[in-house]
A protein has these predicted regions:
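Gly/Trp-centered helix-boundary motif
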Residues: 1-175, 179
Length: 181
């Protein structure tokens, strides 16, 4: 075994390919923290929330609905940032800008914040685009979008993980069947 490993390590292309594969697979195991349409962490009033891990209805953040909060909506972002002000339904952009210093209408607010993954799209998130899909790479979609306006990079990350996990499971099952039969 040691001789085989030594020969493998001497083949630089094979050795570096193994390292690239291991790193890519390791990164893909944390796909939810890298590419997701839910925030990693939300601070709202006195609490911390992790929408990647747990379901939170919009009511948790001062909204009206019992369904899951759509964190990408400007109104939900306004509710979180301003501590649940009901004026967020009328002029969310203005309130978010005013909330930057922690004061709105000369009153202090419990300022909240949101930590997003580097790629704020899940593999199934359909994006609203200014042009027809598929779209070329831009600042929002680093590798562009596919023909149904979904982020290509997010789909690659999740697809790579799914493909490798499937290959590992098939290999283990085939080996087990081959040994037992």
């Amino acid at each position: 075994h040691r001789r085989r490993w030594r020969n493998f390590c001497q083949n630089r292309r094979a050795f570096w390919s193994l390292w690239i594969f291991v790193i890519a697979f390791g990164v893909s195991l944390f796909a939810e923290l890298i590419a997701n349409d839910r925030p990693i962490l939300v601070k709202y009033r006195d609490g911390f929330y992790s929408p990647i891990v747990k379901f939170y209805p919009e009511q948790t953040f001062g909204g009206d609905l019992r369904t899951e909060a759509i964190y990408a909506d400007i109104e939900v972002e306004c509710l979180i940032v301003t501590g649940g002000l009901t004026d967020c339904w009328d002029s969310p952009e203005m309130l978010i800008a005013e909330a930057a210093d922690g004061i709105i209408d000369n009153r202090p607010i419990e300022r909240g914040w949101i930590i997003w993954p580097p790629i704020p799209y899940h593999h199934s998130t359909v994006s609203t685009l200014d042009m027809p899909a598929p779209s070329p790479p831009d600042a929002d979609h680093w590798l562009g979008t596919d023909d149904t306006a979904r982020d290509v990079l997010a789909r690659i990350i999740y697809g790579f993980r799914l493909s490798v996990m499937f290959a590992i499971i098939v290999s283990v099952l085939a080996s087990a069947i081959g040994i037992l039969v």
